[in-house]
Amino acid sequence: PQQEKPQENKKHLNFISREHMLFATPFWQTKVEGVDNEPIKKYCYELRDKTKGVVISNRGGWHSKEILQPIPDELKNFFNQVQGWANNYCAQITGITDLVLGNWWVNINPPGTYNRRHDHQKSILSGVYYVDCEGENIGRLVVERDDNMEFFTTRYQTTSPMCMNNFNMLPYTGFLLMFPAWVYHSVEINRENRDRISIAFNLVDPNQRFEEYGKT
């Protein structure tokens, strides 16, 4: 007898696919134009010479105490621009448009010094601006992810943004980077025969009290 053909399965699965880029970490980088770094550099050295520094993330070098207000004349133009940039940047990712400058400080790293891994708790955005920073061995700025990706020691650990554990940037005079304050970051040893000078800062909710601002 003729064998019965098996019935074809005519059911098809329909997939509606959608890509979700969840938990992305935005960074904003620019080269600052229109800011005279020479008076800022002079201010940084004068501040170092007349005030006692602190040890927080710095290993060697000089780290000023946190500064709230008033902003010195040498930095008013710079911080006015920073606040505008920060709110534009933050508006694109959160809708927040009223961040204000919280605290800021000066870092002077002579040869052989560096800044260890740290974050800036209780702030919303953090940033760093390099006032004087030249040379291939001046020390890279390193930002790190903190979601256990380091446990996946596989061939997938590539330079893909999805797989990398950290990202290194070689700063230069005029380099500005802003990022979410919870991002861990560090700065490598300065191996040049000159100082590395930077100004770091935090931007916060305008209703946040000064004593709540994040520390380095």
Question: Model segments located where?
Answer:
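Cationic, low-complexity basic patches in intrinsically disordered or flexible, solvent-exposed regions
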Residues: 3-6
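Non-heme Fe(II)/2-oxoglutarate
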Residues: 9-96, 114
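Hydrophobic residues positioned within well-ordered beta-strands of beta-sheet architectures
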Residues: 28, 102-104, 125-127, 197-201
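A short coil-to-beta-strand element that immediately follows conserved catalytic motifs
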Residues: 94-104
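Short loop/turn segments at connectors of secondary-structure elements within structured domains
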Residues: 100, 135-137, 193
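Catalytic core of non-heme Fe(II) oxygenases with the double-stranded beta-helix
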Residues: 106-178, 188, 205, 209-214
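Ligand-binding loop in jelly-roll beta-barrel domains
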Residues: 187-198
